[in-house]
Swiss-Prot record:
Pfam families: Formyl_trans_C, Formyl_trans_N. GO terms for cellular component: cytosol. Its EC number is 2.1.2.9. This is Methionyl-tRNA formyltransferase. The gene is fmt. GO terms for molecular function: methionyl-tRNA formyltransferase activity. NCBIfam families: fmt. Attaches a formyl group to the free amino group of methionyl-tRNA(fMet). The formyl group appears to play a dual role in the initiator identity of N-formylmethionyl-tRNA by promoting its recognition by IF2 and preventing the misappropriation of this tRNA by the elongation apparatus.
């Protein structure tokens, strides 16, 4: 049974904590938890523990927070736990080969895509950005490459037309733990089957940047709408009006609508939203956040700032 495995867990954010919680609930033998060092957060910039650390401490699990696993002291902490396997979920630190070789059965990773599609740092966001109709989680053996290890298990999740990165993150956080438990059971029983990735099918999920969140009105409306959902809740798509950034939390595509106006031109502003000409089609903005304000419906924004959204105005 998988509860006989001595497991090291390594992870940092809430997504990882949900997987650790599943291991704890299933009475797995977690012998140590690795997570990133406490970071300053909040208005007071106080040192704040990660969700994984908070959960581990509530269950009296040993916690280790090395700044790096490349140094001997961090590697020694792993070695002294005599683990059978190391489970890595959104840890945020690179595991050198010396660490990958320490557990008897190696290290496995929970990755938020259907590998080999979307290897890399932002698989959830890139799946939305590209218009994929499905994604999922892959449990893989870890090697020295970037998400290149052999695959042990996949769980598929449909992407809905209104999914954001936040909603898709939650969906994957729900299916990932069961996939992990199933994989551990197979490994413990000696029944796990590893499937090599087809490198010819690989795509890469580059890390997000604030710069690419700026809306380029020359793109098609459908692509812009996907960008808005992909960059929610971070870094949030935006445009500029009178040199002030306005964040876009939600938008829709006006099906069948076309415009001969220059991309970025406001075509209309009504209760349905602010209609913008794009490189192909019309985008309707429905939830905005002016600088220094909270996010609000377009109707509320127009009630106070309608003069800023006169048809014919061209947005930056």
């Amino acid at each position: 049974m998988s509860d006989s495995l001595r497991i090291i867990f390594a992870g940092t954010p809430d997504f990882a904590a949900r997987h650790l919680d599943a291991l704890i609930d299933a009475k797995q033998q977690v012998v140590g938890v690795f997570t990133q060092p406490d970071r300053p957060a909040g208005r007071g910039n106080r040192l704040t523990p990660s969700p994984v650390k908070e959960l581990a401490e509530r269950h009296d699990l040993p916690v280790f927070q090395p700044a790096s696993l490349r140094k001997p002291e961090g590697q020694r902490s792993v070695a002294e736990l005599n683990a059978d396997i190391m489970v890595v979920v959104a840890y945020g630190l690179i595991l050198p080969q010396a660490v990958l070789d320490l557990p008897l059965l190696g290290c496995i990773n929970v990755h938020g895509s259907l590998l080999p599609r979307w290897r890399g740092a932002a698989p959830i966001q890139r799946a939305l950005w590209a218009g994929d109709d499905r994604t999922g989680v892959t449990i893989m053996q870890m090697d020295a490459g970037l998400d290149t290890g052999a695959m042990l298990h996949k769980a598929v999740c449909a992407i809905q037309h209104d999914d954001t990165s936040a909603s898709l993150y939650d969906k994957l956080a729900q299916i990932g733990p069961n996939a992990l438990l199933s994989t551990l059971t197979q490994i413990a029983a000696g029944r796990a089957v590893a499937e090599s990735q087809d490198n010819a099918l690989a795509t890469y999920a580059d890390k997000l940047s604030k710069e690419e969140a700026r809306l380029d009105w020359r793109l098609p409306a459908a692509q812009l709408e996907r960008c808005i959902r992909a960059f929610n809740p971070w870094p949030i798509s935006y445009f500029s009006l009178a040199e002030q950034p306005i964040k876009v939390w939600a938008a829709g595509v006006d099906d069948g609508q076309t415009s001969s106006h220059a991309p970025g031109t406001i075509l209309a502003a009504d209760k349905a939203g602010i209609h913008i000409a794009t490189g192909a089609g019309v985008l309707t903005l429905t939830q905005l956040q002016p600088a220094g304000k909270k996010a609000m419906s377009v109707q509320d924004l127009l009630n106070s700032r309608r003069e800023s959204f006169i048809p014919g105005t061209v947005l930056d």
